[in-house]
Amino acid sequence: MENLAELPSPWFVYLVRCANNALYCGITTDVSRRFAQHQKGRGAKALRGKGPLELVWSLPVADGKSAALKLEYRIKALSKSQKEALVAGMARIDQLEIIFQ
């Protein structure tokens, strides 16, 4: 049995809604910690002064940081309406895979 301390931290891709209704996409190993950083102005520079912020979507990524970075890149390439469909639960990442090919 593996030692739990040796297991890698799971990665997450997340979307934050800004006051101007824009969606920011990022990755982290701890969504609540990262969102708290964004709210305090210590996260991404792109979100500073854009509050109030709302965490609207997150997804665990099983295959580590590299896979999370690739998914983040793909989500950032989606249109606003496609991102909104993810947030609303009307679309799943696997349904959008056609767009990524």
From Swiss-Prot:
Gene3D superfamilies: GIY-YIG endonuclease. Signal peptide: none annotated. InterPro entries: GIY-YIG_endonuc, GIY-YIG_endonuc_sf, UPF0213_domain. Residues 9-85 form the GIY-YIG domain. Coiled coil: none annotated. It holds the Pfam family GIY-YIG. It comes from the Bacteria. Belongs to the UPF0213 family. PANTHER family: UPF0213 PROTEIN YHBQ. This is UPF0213 protein VC_A0739. It comes from Vibrio cholerae serotype O1 (strain ATCC 39315 / El Tor Inaba N16961).
